[in-house]
Structures are given as C-alpha cells and as structure tokens.
C-alpha cells in the first residue's frame, strides 16, 4: 500500500487501515515465527490440520503481543492498555458491550488480503451463556481456577502464513487520525521483518526434562464415585421426561512446571486437529487441539458442524473401514446425531434468513489420530441485520457440550457439576475486523495457571447410559492431553508404552459411549 492509497482510504472515513508486507514462506514455520516475533504475554498461535491430521490447512496466524485487552468477570468489564488497568465498570450485557467495542474500529474492504488480518482474539467461556439465559444467571458453581469469563486481545500486529501461495503476510494497522500513522506502520513492519530474521533461542531447542508423569497423577475434582452416582441421578430425570440428554463433565488437574509452549508442541505432534491454538494470556495459558467448530460466520454464511458418535481407529485399513460401517449402522449413534443436527438447525435458525438453513453435509465420517467421528454440516445465511455476536448468542454452548433440551440440560449441569466450567465448553477464536468470526469449542484443551494444569472432559448421559462407561469416556477424551503432558515432561522425547506403561493409549480397546464425541 502506497501513502497515496492509504490517504484515499482514510478520506473515506476508515480509522483502522491494514498496512501489509509480503515475504516468502520457505524458511520459516508458524511455530518458529511465533517463537521469534511473538512469544510473550497476550500473544497467540492459531493453526489447523485437515481431517485426520494428514496435512496442514491453508492459513496459520501468529498474533504479536496485544497492547489493549478486554476482560469480563461476571458483569464487570476491565480494560487494560500495555499491562495497566485503565478502566473498570459494571455492564448489564457484556456481549452487547463487546459488539459495540469492536464497532469503534472502522475497517475498510480491501481485496487481495488473507482471510484474517487481525481482530478481537481470545475466548468466550462456557458461562457466557448466562448473559443470554437469564434464568441461569445466579446458579453458577464455585469458581476454582479464576480466569475471566471473557478475554479478548485487540490484535493489530499479526503474521499470516498462506501455505497455498507460499507467502507470509506481515500485517499491522494504522489510524489516520495520527499524522505519522503510515510511517509508524512501516516502521512496525520493519521491526517484524527484523525479528523474523532472528535465530531460535537455545532454550527452545533444548527443552528441560521434568518428572515422569502417569495418568493417575491427574486428580479429579469430581471423583469417580460421585460422578457415576450423578449419572444415575440424571438418568432419573431422563426417565421422568424432564430431559433427553445431559453432558456431564469432570475436571482433572496436575502440578505443572513445564513450558506451556512445549506442551503445545507435544499436542500438535500427537493429535493434530482442525483447531489448534496456543494463547499466552499473561498469568495463564490455553493449549488446545480441538476437533470441532463452535460457529463460523464468513461474509454472511453461517456454519456449525456437530460431531457426535465415536469409534476408535482401526489397526489396519480393513479394520478401520469395518469400524466406520459399524458406527454408521448403530441406530443409537444415528438417533443421537440426528438430535444434535436438529439442535444446530434450531440454534442458527434464530438468526438466519427464513428458508436458508440446510444440512449441507450429512453424517460423514471424520478421522483423527486415535478416533473417528460422525460429522454433519449445518449452514445458513445470516439475516441482514445479523452479526457475529448474534451468532455466538444463538449457539453458545453447543448441544454437544450441554444436552437437550438445551436450557434444561444447562440447569442440570449447574445442579451436579462441582465447579464452574470456565473456559471449557466455551468458544475460542476470533472476531475479525471485517465482521467475520471463526470459533472452536474449547475441548481437548489445557488451561495452565499458578503452576497447575487443568483438563476437562464430558460424556453425554442418555437413558441407557452405563455410569462406569461414562466415566471411562471422560478419561479417554482427556488422554491426548495426558500424553502431551508426559511428552513435555520428557523433554519432548517420545516415550513408548514400554517406558511409561501407565500412559498407554487405551483408545485401542475402549468401549465408546454413543453420541458424545465432542465433550
């Protein structure tokens, strides 16, 4: 962009103008770029592996440390700039505040830019649903971890990798109200280029080893006895016709002194997934390899994609195909998947144009490193007055993390789960400056805070659930994090099961409870 182009766009009234530079992407990876240019508080790395983890998707995003941060605790808004709190106030509707906050950044439509150039990046926790479902506003379980209900970074300096075109886009933003804005933006891009040319620190190349980790070292805040007892109590609700399904979850924790970035490196190696993210949020970190979209808005097109129904991967291609056929022939799996499709259609139907909602992909099988899931695509066209926040209000939390009917299931979750879910089950991703949104469900996700690592997983309780198998299902879903922690503490060396037999992958022999692939 030339100074003349910049001035012309500014004359149209835009105050948040992207200024970019391109490099070849043949000498760096998104991970090495993150280490060199971003690794610090309020930074992030977003990556994506295609189905099965066999190849990486087109775009990866690196966010440099953000200067402005928006946090929400209940109904209290906290604004920070460069590490200093600048405002704190009460707000009736935090979701409405977030929407209005973003509108102050007037972003121009410019062709030729990558799908993402920056925006509000972070998460909306599971408990954000209480801003929408007023009857649940006062039933929040105790908050043990203490993370904000919402945290969003104002991400203006980003590096976007385009693996198809082999390019790296360096992007910053400038406000023309500052006479030197364009020149300052060019200087920031120069600085980014300089950082890209650095060497990777030796500490990253030689990670330290920690203690040997076993699965039983993770401590549940729920406990198997109480969890299985509560599964039976939920089945009573189901028999009485009060609810059809409830996704009950348990949280596990372990002392963790390792580097969170190394945990991400381990997890992306062990379990590549469509939504992989590492977020350094000052006093805590989020590390995740989520298989499931929560909601996406792309130029008016709405997408949700229920995952429900699970089988392990076969040891051979023949066995893999046999397990797929078994999965698609299981009437219980199919019935529960159809229920979740209906929930998705109902959710987005509230904010989409009449007649636009359709099931664009029906019950395909997606394969990942250890499991396969039934997946369907539900799509629609958002109403003319609709926004990304309207879509988030309509979909959070998704049925695969709550149950059906949704509101009654949410009430039952509050009744039984001993701790506030927090980030688990919420939405992690971005609201881009151009009005689009892409968010994943916060599952297969570790939260690291105060030298402890937390992982949470759930199971869908239905009328014929076996309590012991529901408990086992939560353990199986957490296993990718268990293994990643063990690999991190080994110095990122790969331990096989003979070296650490209690961390073996029981997915090979597990019994799968139908209909709860996501949680």
Explain the meaning of each model-derived region:
Residues 1-519:
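Extended alpha-helical targeting/anchoring segments
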